[in-house]
């Protein structure tokens, strides 16, 4: 009996654990502190700083089953997903890693033992082929002489991509950084399937499938292209779980493995589909994996960066559901089946299931409304079309503004025998991609970052000032030996009391003083294992090797401590009041207050906000001790400590406890007891995205200042209304009700005035070939009344074209109305657009009703004067 996908995953981890590898949990799909990546797309991403020498672990061998997404940027598989046997937006990458430990010999031997060993995967040896980089004789000889693979099944692959080291068998992290040759292992499905071995003209067939890539990191590529040998060569490997599962389960497509078959049946169940071979089922089964895990890792649908990619995947899945016949929301219903099928690998998803379902449902409902608006706009554009092709710019505008997929636009057009300019659409899309690349923070060059050898010892938990030595200076990213007065610089010390920004807490400010110099620290940041003090030399000369007195801004630090401790109390209170689905999605803790983003699917009710505030203040009054303990990460999680979103933890972590109320992993600076916080007040609660809420709050003196300000406003209001605080509410309520009544009466008067104006205007209409034309500028009429007047006049005049305009505060407002029987000749949108162009504005709308605005009021009479000849030409 073949192994299940879950058993294959576990067997891989067990094998490498038996070879002395540390089993490391999958990292977030949102890369931690890595500006070069949109999503985690490979197993090595979480070890990138280790390979770069910027981070150290207490192990030199690791193995993971890493969740990955490839659906944006360089690695974009989205359009192929569902239509090929092996493309996915979400997949799991099995990997083993050596950080300066073993190299080519052991890496190859381990791979061979796992793949062919009887107690492991037990694949037939004669079905396995390998490739090596053309000049990598060492790897070739290991495969041939030690493993025993015949020469005819070992293929050398050279530079096949038009540049030196540009090869399928030479891996590089980016344009610069660690790189090296790789060896790939292929499985031969047999001659009953078309395709040739790697390197042959038929290599794109499905017979020979790559199952494992083993990268030998030997070099550090410089900006000028030169290759410098790494002091400690390393190994990075990757084997797609879905691919090896297909091989071990004796199927030719990843979508035929047990995991996908269960999901495909679940998709069919919620959409009502009966043909289980329909490719749309594959698309949706793949997309629910990427969407659910991205949301669980903190990504929310939006119109930029990661959120935009997520939105595209969700909407692609929804469209395929519609193609299958789904009439109602269905996508969110697949989260439960996904949790079941992922098992232990989906524990975090299970904890956040309700939140993920709510975000998906909200997005699905929003897209349904978007589709309706998009179809209306498309109908209008097609009604104006004179040829048989819809231009690419319009198709792109539908896609960009309404999320209207171009293939759906093409489907609608096809029903009317209209083509879509797909080349024009692609050109507009590429222009958007170019702008996104230019404005994006992704794609940083690691060699351009400050690189610091050595580390700084942080002593800020116990000290706010100490004497230290300058170990490095940087100006404009370059290492220097000294800094002079007025220069901006980064100062690195051997030890420091300054806290570097991390976990949402801002970096410390303060001063570094010494022999005739003062350096003002405006921020503190981490650079690998070093801590950089960012600021300006106020006076004197500062040199590497000098002694300094490092002094943190005490008062500012104290305010930050209170706010950070209050954040932990509030997090725990939110989980008590709203539920355990609440998870931190981001935070900012500074000396002014705190900002906390968390998962919750609706706005908090006033009574819920009050409960959270009361609960936090109750813990403050209890004056609980705030204690820290350092322990293993796994032990901390077992204790129930919550981890903070977006934070990267070492193997030994600080666990912060506030009595029996809160336990979290945190490396930040905190108060000694909860009573130090004094007072906690919530300033605001708002939404930042679907399924994400934000609370802003203040503590201590800041909270007291807020109370004073609120009391001052209350007293001022009481004085203005000649009321005391007890009767103030009743007085304001009565005033609001009276104002409402007066506004209603005023609106009625305006409508009566508009009706009278309409009656007077109808007599001024002129007849043009049986159609009444009325053009008029009205004084003293509110712009929003023009539409009502146009509707009245259309009813009075019958077949008609009406243009009304008014000027308010120097701005022109225009409304054009055309009776239905005339819209085949005169379209309101075109008419109002012609007028708007003359008054410095723009507008649009339906063929029977359109509106516009403009800024050139002086040009209005002439613009209105041009209407009669324009309409006459159409009639």
Curated annotation (Swiss-Prot):
It is an enzyme of class 6 (ligase). GO terms for cellular component: cytosol. Zn(2+) binds at residues 564, 568, 666, 670. SMART domains: tRNA_SAD (SM00863). Transmembrane segments: none annotated. It comes from the Bacteria. Consists of three domains; the N-terminal catalytic domain, the editing domain and the C-terminal C-Ala domain. The editing domain removes incorrectly charged amino acids, while the C-Ala domain, along with tRNA(Ala), serves as a bridge to cooperatively bring together the editing and aminoacylation centers thus stimulating deacylation of misacylated tRNAs. This is Alanine--tRNA ligase. It comes from Cronobacter sakazakii (strain ATCC BAA-894) (Enterobacter sakazakii).
């Amino acid at each position: 009996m073949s192994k299940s996908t879950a058993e294959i995953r576990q067997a891989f981890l067990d094998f490498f654990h038996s070879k002395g590898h540390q089993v490391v949990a999958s990292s977030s799909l949102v890369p931690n502190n890595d500006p070069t990546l949109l999503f985690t797309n490979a197993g090595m991403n979480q070890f990138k700083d280790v390979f770069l020498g910027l981070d150290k672990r207490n192990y030199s061998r690791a193995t993971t089953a890493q969740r990955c997404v490839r659906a944006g940027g360089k690695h974009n598989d989205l359009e192929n997903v569902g239509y090929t046997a092996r493309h996915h937006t979400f997949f799991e990458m099995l990997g083993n890693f050596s950080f300066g430990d073993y190299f080519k010999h052991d890496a190859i031997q381990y791979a061979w033992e796992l793949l062919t060993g009887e107690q492991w995967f037990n694949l037939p040896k004669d079905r396995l082929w390998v490739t090596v980089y053309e000049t990598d004789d060492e790897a070739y000889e290991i495969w041939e002489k030690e493993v025993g693979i015949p020469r005819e099944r070992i293929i050398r692959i050279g530079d096949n991509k038009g540049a030196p080291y540009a090869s399928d068998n030479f891996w590089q992290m980016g344009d610069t950084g660690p790189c090296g040759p790789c060896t790939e292992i292929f499985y031969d499905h047999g001659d009953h399937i078309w395709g040739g071995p790697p390197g042959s003209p038929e290599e794109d067939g499905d017979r020979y499938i790559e199952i494992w890539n083993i990268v030998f990191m030997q070099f550090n590529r410089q900006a000028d292209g030169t290759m410098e040998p790494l002091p400690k060569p390393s190994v990075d490997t990757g084997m797609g779980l879905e691919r090896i599962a297909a091989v071990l389960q004796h199927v030719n497509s990843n979508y035929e493995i047990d995991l996908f078959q269960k999901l495909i049946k679940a998709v069919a169940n919620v959409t009502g589909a009966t043909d289980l071979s329909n490719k749309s089922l594959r698309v949706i089964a793949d997309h629910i994996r990427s969407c659910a895990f991205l949301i669980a890792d903190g990504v929310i649908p939006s119109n930029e960066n990661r959120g935009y990619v997520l939105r595209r995947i969700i909407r692609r899945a929804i469209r395929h559901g519609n193609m299958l016949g789904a009439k109602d929301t269905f996508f969110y219903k697949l989260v439960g089946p996904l949790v079941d099928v992922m098992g232990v690998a989906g524990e975090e998803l299970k904890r956040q299931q309700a939140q993920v379902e709510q975000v998906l449902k909200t997005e699905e409902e929003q897209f349904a409304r978007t589709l309706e608006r998009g179809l209306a706009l498309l109908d209008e554009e097609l009604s104006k079309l004179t040829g048989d092709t819809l231009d690419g710019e319009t198709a792109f505008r539908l896609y960009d503004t309404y999320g209207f997929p171009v293939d759906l636009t093409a489907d609608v057009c096809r029903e009317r025998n209209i083509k879509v300019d797909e080349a024009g659409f692609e050109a507009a899309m590429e222009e958007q991609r170019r702008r996104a690349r230019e404005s994006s923070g992704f794609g940083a060059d690691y060699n351009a970052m400050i690189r610091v050898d050595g580390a700084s010892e942080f002593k800020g938990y116990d000290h706010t000032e100490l004497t230290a030595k300058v170990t490095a200076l940087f100006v404009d990213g370059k290492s220097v030996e000294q800094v002079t007065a007025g220069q901006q610089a980064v100062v690195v010390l051997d030890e420091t009391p300054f806290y570097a920004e991390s976990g949402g807490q801002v970096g410390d400010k303060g001063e570094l003083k010494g022999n005739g110099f003062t350096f003002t620290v405006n921020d503190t940041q981490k650079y690998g294992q070093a801590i950089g003090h960012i600021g300006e030399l106020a006076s004197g000369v500062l040199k590497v090797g000098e002694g300094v007195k490092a002094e943190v801004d005490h008062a500012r630090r104290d305010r930050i401590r209170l706010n950070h401790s209050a954040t932990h109390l509030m997090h725990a209170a939110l989980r008590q009041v709203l539920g355990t689905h609440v998870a931190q999605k981001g935070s900012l803790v500074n000396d002014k207050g705190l900002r906390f983003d968390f998962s919750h699917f609706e706005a908090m009710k006033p009574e819920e906000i009050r409960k959270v505030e009361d609960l936090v203040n109750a813990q403050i009054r209890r004056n609980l001790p705030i204690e820290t303990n350092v322990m293993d990460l796994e032990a901390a999680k077992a204790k129930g400590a919550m981890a903070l979103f977006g934070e990267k933890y070492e193997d030994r972590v600080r666990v912060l406890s506030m009595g029996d109320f809160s336990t979290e992993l945190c490396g930040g600076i905190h108060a000694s007891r909860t009573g130090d916080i004094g007072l906690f007040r919530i300033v605001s609660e708002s939404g930042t995205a679907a399924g994400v809420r934000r609370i802003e709050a203040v503590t201590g003196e800041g909270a007291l200042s807020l109370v004073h300000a609120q009391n001052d406003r209350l007293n001022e209001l009481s004085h203005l209304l000649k009321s005391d605080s007890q009767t103030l509410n009743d007085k304001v309520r009565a005033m609001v009700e009276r104002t409402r009544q007066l506004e209603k009466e005023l609106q009625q008067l305006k409508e009566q005035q508009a009706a009278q104006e309409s009656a007077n205007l109808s007599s001024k209409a002129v007849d043009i070939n049986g159609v009444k034309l009325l053009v008029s500028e009205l004084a003293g009429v509110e712009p929003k009344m023009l539409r009502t007047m146009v509707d009245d006049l259309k009813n009075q005049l019958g077949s008609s074209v009406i243009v009304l305009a008014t000027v308010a505060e120097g701005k022109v407002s225009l409304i054009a109305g055309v009776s239905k029987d005339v819209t085949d000749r005169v379209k309101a949108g075109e008419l109002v657009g012609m007028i708007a162009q003359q008054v410095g504005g723009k507008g649009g709308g339906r063929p029977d009703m359109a509106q516009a605005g403009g800024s050139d009021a002086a040009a209005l009479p002439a613009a209105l004067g041009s209407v009669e000849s324009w309409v006459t030409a159409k009639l």
